[in-house]
């Protein structure tokens, strides 16, 4: 019995993501799964695409984006899909769209406007953000970081030109735990920016430790990328 597939992409240079050299061949797709890689000439399909020698590869992961809001506003994500990107990591540089509710009593510190204005920060929890994403799924996968600057701005009510108090750190740690339990992959910081510049290492470490208990990672935009680069890393 002849093997069947929905889509065949043939006459391609196949890069399979294992580190192996590209090889001539193709892939077969059935439903939402790749069901064969390599010689697909004997497989029948309702739709066959001649790649004309172009590369067929796994989707790319864009590991540094600020796509938090774009994922909701433009779920087709043509800006990524047309580049071969199928997964984005957002919430970088200490700025995430959630968990954060702004106040009319204080201004959002720099660089919070990177993701939008006060009206666009409308998710009091990461869980609320995740539900909005699930309601209108984007065309790409998303791995989300919880932003230290976002946490600081809310916990300190915009008064970010100082270290956080023990109580404020405890509030941020609680938010990190809630965010990790709702599906985030870790915490990010943007220590070069006004919102995070005055945070001592101990404050950042406290949040990274909270994420680490869930297997989360820590990503940073360093305090300095020039003369004090080595000091920033240390």
What is the role of each PLM region?
Residues 1-8, 14-59:
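Histidine-rich, glycine-flanked metal-binding segment
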Residues 128-129, 163-189, 195-234:
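Histidine/acidic residue-rich metal-binding segments in metalloenzymes
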Residues 12, 27, 32, 53, ...:
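Divalent metal-coordination and catalytic microenvironments
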Residues 73-185:
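Divalent-metal coordination cores built from histidine and acidic residues
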Residues 70, 125, 146, 222, ...:
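Catalytic cores and adjacent flexible loops of soluble metabolic enzymes
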Residues 68-71, 95-98, 152, 193-196, ...:
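Active-site environment of divalent metal-dependent phosphoester hydrolases
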Residues 61-65, 88-90, 142-146, 187-189, ...:
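Hydrophobic faces of well-ordered beta-strands that scaffold small-molecule active sites
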